[in-house]
Amino acid sequence: MNDSRYIGRFAPTPSGFLHFGSLVAALASWLDARAVNGRWLLRMEDTDPPREMPGARDAILQTLERYGLEWDGEVVFQSQRHEAYAAVVDRLFNMGLAYACTCSRKQLEGYDGIYPGFCRNAGHAREGAAIRLRVPELIYRFSDRVQGAFEQHLGREVGDFVIQRRDGLYAYQLAVVLDDAWQGVTDIVRGADLLDNTPRQLYLQELLGFSQPRYLHIPLIVQPDGHKLGKSYRSPPLEADQATPLLLRALRALGQQADPALIGASPAEVLAVARQQWQPDNIARQMTVPEADLR
């Protein structure tokens, strides 16, 4: 298959080094793009400076290169896109589609993350407040390429959500939608922990007149206690001299062929074979895969 119109992306957060779970996500999105001769973009989701780890940006780029996951074009940094985000927040606020919220975390305790609408009609000034997007009492549905049909009632299951924090930083939901549209992304391949974020992004896409990408949410790699691999759980960083065995393990996590005969091959050779054999239909339709099952 050849689809040069395909544009995928990998968008890590520089809050730490890449780990095995990151590799599985990067590999899935890279293979999905390269298997159809599409483009694969790299975007650094660095909208939250307090969470950034010094040196993580460069380490992420170096790790991807060492593992043979080369990207197209220049790396995009969300920290350089604030003007675009601000313009859209202003637009939504001025249209009455967003409003200022002064609620504290303590006020919102006990609502299970569903905003109860305290500030919806309060008319607060924007200064020092968060900005929330009004959501409709509608069900948003989409078909995920792995997880299948998914739906969410935005009003009941999420409530009005933040697009700009009270400290002025822009929320993930806003930035990801604007950047995917700006970069022309047609296909989003990412972890299943973001599956329930998708309806919020569909709503924003609809409001702003953007095309809807195709979505593929892969199972998360989890530790024995059920927590996903991640920086907050001190998951070990990817080692440069383990690229080939870890790529083969990542292929197994994605339900792909991982020929043991390739153990002595270079990362580029492993990726060349995997690209030809990529079968996204073989990815398990489940939310998690225990890392212990892959050893």
Swiss-Prot record:
Record flagged with keyword Zinc:
yes
Q: Which residues bind ATP?
A: 231
Query: Motif ('HIGH' region) spans which residues?
Result: 12-22
Q: Which GO terms describe its cellular component?
A: cytosol
Residues the record lists as binding L-glutamate: 9-13, 45, 172, 190
Q: Which Pfam families match?
A: tRNA-synt_1c (PF00749)
What EC number(s) is this enzyme filed under?
6.1.1.-
Which GO terms of type biological process are on file?
glutamyl-tRNA aminoacylation; tRNA modification
Protein origin, superkingdom: Bacteria
- Motif 'KMSKS' region: list the residue ranges: 228-232
Residues engaged in binding Zn(2+): 101, 103, 115, 119
Please name the Gene3D superfamilies in this protein's record.
Glutamyl-tRNA Synthetase, Domain 3, HUPs
Similarity comment: Belongs to the class-I aminoacyl-tRNA synthetase family. GluQ subfamily.
Q: What is this protein for, i.e. what is its function?
A: Catalyzes the tRNA-independent activation of glutamate in presence of ATP and the subsequent transfer of glutamate onto a tRNA(Asp). Glutamate is transferred on the 2-amino-5-(4,5-dihydroxy-2-cyclopenten-1-yl) moiety of the queuosine in the wobble position of the QUC anticodon.
Note the HAMAP family from the entry.
Answer: Glu_Q_tRNA_synth
PANTHER family, per this entry? GLUTAMATE--TRNA LIGASE, GLUTAMYL-Q TRNA(ASP) SYNTHETASE
Name this polypeptide is given: Glutamyl-Q tRNA(Asp) synthetase
The top of its lineage is:
Bacteria, Pseudomonadati, Pseudomonadota, Gammaproteobacteria, Pseudomonadales
What gene name is listed for this protein? Answer: gluQ
